[in-house]
Amino acid sequence: MLVWLAEHLVKYYSGFNVFSYLTFRAIVSLLTALFISLWMGPRMIARLQKLSFGQVVRNDGPESHFSKRGTPTMGGIMILTSIVISVLLWAYPSNPYVWCVLVVLIGYGIIGFVDDYRKVVRKDTKGLIARWKYFWMSVIALGVAFALYLVGKDTPATQLVVPFFKDVMPQLGLFYILLSYFVIVGTGNAVNLTDGLDGLAIMPTVFVAAGFALVAWATGNMNFANYLHIPYLRHAGELVIVCTAIVGAGLGFLWFNTYPAQVFMGDVGSLALGGALGIIAVLLRQEFLLVIMGGVFVVETLSVILQVGSFKLRGQRIFRMAPIHHHYELKGWPEPRVIVRFWIISLMLVLIGLATLKVR
């Protein structure tokens, strides 16, 4: 919005030309989302407390979590609000990639909101029925994937980028739709599963978004894309603005979500952020990179799959409790230790993921 306005005002004052610089807009996008999130935080927490929108805690969970019962949840609303406002202000409104991310972000946010609302207001511990949750998540993911396939068919936008191999970028054909679906829905659920401790999900999300900001910048720059042997995608540069907005909103939320948390993001935040990371990976053709950089989310999800599978097949559990962060809690690790160690692992994985772009 402001970019469009600046383009019309630059003929009156050349200083408005600064709005055309991607680096400048990335920085102010981050700061805008950060300040909106910090401003909304106390007001959102007070409002959620007044409405008695408190966290529901499992009776079979770690005893240390019982004290969290009643802590305001659905704080993801302020994350999404911060991201959307910042992106609309600083990204080019004509960029289709930006709108793809916003559709998934808002769509998954609505699904998460309904799920949280049923849990918190209607006191339904199961929330939105699983089949309906997956149905609507699938509708959004398949809709976006199909639209992208129709537009980008037989172009670099539908190639598969394979790490470590600079000349291996096969055309996916219709498999592009299926892969995109699994990445978007899978990442949405993976971040949702990770969101079980104070600040555990938001910081890896920030790290991955920051990593993708660098990848988006390189992908949207023909010289760097050729240098790194990744597809050049002319719309990818604007995803830098989206990624930095996620970073800013995430850091602002962490101010209130750090241990001991004053507010939880709820499904409205975790599903939306996960879906956003998934569609960003799809748009940048970096699904494999997401698996590496988002390794914490992958391990959390695998721990649940292995736990359920083992119990159904053998009648035995592999972990004391899944997702795996609860396993370490039940082993006696203090919650802050689990959180910070997962943060460190996440940062390392993002750096390793970025390094794979050059190792080809």
Curated annotation (Swiss-Prot):
Cofactor(s), by name: Mg(2+)
Swiss-Prot/TrEMBL catalytic activity: UDP-N-acetyl-alpha-D-muramoyl-L-alanyl-gamma-D-glutamyl-meso-2,6-diaminopimeloyl-D-alanyl-D-alanine + di-trans,octa-cis-undecaprenyl phosphate = di-trans,octa-cis-undecaprenyl diphospho-N-acetyl-alpha-D-muramoyl-L-alanyl-D-glutamyl-meso-2,6-diaminopimeloyl-D-alanyl-D-alanine + UMP
Pfam families with a match to the protein in the record: Glycos_transf_4, MraY_sig1
Location relative to the cell: Cell inner membrane
Segments in the Cytoplasmic topological domain: 47-71, 115-131, 189-198, 257-262, 309-337
One GO biological process term: regulation of cell shape
Membrane topology: Multi-pass membrane protein
CDD domains hit by this protein: GT_MraY
Residue ranges of the TM segments: 26-46, 72-92, 94-114, 132-152, 168-188, 199-219, 236-256, 263-283, 288-308, 338-358
GO MF terms, alphabetically ordered: metal ion binding; phospho-N-acetylmuramoyl-pentapeptide-transferase activity; UDP-N-acetylmuramoyl-L-alanyl-D-glutamyl-meso-2,6-diaminopimelyl-D-alanyl-D-alanine:undecaprenyl-phosphate transferase activity
EC number: 2.7.8.13
Gene Ontology cellular component list: plasma membrane
Class in the EC hierarchy, top level: transferase
Keyword terms, alphabetized: Cell cycle, Cell division, Cell inner membrane, Cell membrane, Cell shape, Cell wall biogenesis/degradation, Magnesium, Membrane, Metal-binding, Peptidoglycan synthesis, Transferase, Transmembrane, Transmembrane helix
Periplasmic side: 1-25, 93, 153-167, 220-235, 284-287, 359-360
HAMAP family: MraY (MF_00038)
Physiological role: Catalyzes the initial step of the lipid cycle reactions in the biosynthesis of the cell wall peptidoglycan: transfers peptidoglycan precursor phospho-MurNAc-pentapeptide from UDP-MurNAc-pentapeptide onto the lipid carrier undecaprenyl phosphate, yielding undecaprenyl-pyrophosphoryl-MurNAc-pentapeptide, known as lipid I.
Family indicated by similarity: Belongs to the glycosyltransferase 4 family. MraY subfamily.
Record protein name field: Phospho-N-acetylmuramoyl-pentapeptide-transferase
